Amino acid sequence: MSELNTAHPVSYFNLHAEGCGYLNRVRIVQPEKGSPYVACTIAAKHGDTANPSTTKFDCRVSGVRAQAIVQQLEAAVNAEKRVFIGFRIGDFMPELFVYQNGVRKGETGVVNNGRLLQVTFAKVDGQAFELPPEEGVAAEATATLPL
């Protein structure tokens, strides 16, 4: 009987995508139930560099360092500057939706939802953006946690 109550370690398979693309629509999402969170859209580039294709990811920003970086870049995104980032996204899944307005009104579209785990580099209008050091962000996050 005691064997049934023995704790077994839980393990997971992780699915991550790494790439680069343009950061858009940085926002705070306030769900009806639950805590607010930072979200963004990434227009990921892939294929031939002369004529790349784009895949959009709608992300909840999950990594502590990623949250700090995205919030620092929010002003540049809102000023319609071109913010190009390197990223790692996890737990992404496609989701269908119906366009509510515009030329594609009534058509079915697909959005890839995921969690933005890491920002590896950033450029604003082609200029390198200095990312905060990893240990500094983790220390700040720990210092601001309620006791």
Language-model segments: what does each one mean?
Residues 1-147:
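Single-stranded nucleic acid-binding surfaces, predominantly the OB-fold ssDNA-binding core
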